């Protein structure tokens, strides 16, 4: 880990390289929630790209020694390599808008010398509520509590966030 961040130095190198390549992406899911202070633990980091064919993705992979594995049948494309083994590529996010619409619903989170876009907690909650899978239902109470606590600590966030937290 790096300075209390939930990423190894190798993972940070890949995220930094994506930003250097000007790849439009955001971190979503429980990793995004954890970066906002929610008490979440997850093994994988879900990345949502504006354009999965952006050449900067493969350039960033090459720079850190990673490999692009194309999609096969119903499986989405994947990354392989020490720097990228815990990153998942998300092609579709249910219950919220498309990438361009949701870009306005992100926060810039500093990660030691650079920042990444992270989907806001209320939008993560909306997506998980829509999916309604057992694993999502299990984390929704904690996500909602975290969202309320964050708003209580920073009341200005209540004006920004339009998602219903109850």
Feature-to-residue mapping (PLM):
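Compositionally biased terminal segments of proteins
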Residues: 1-166
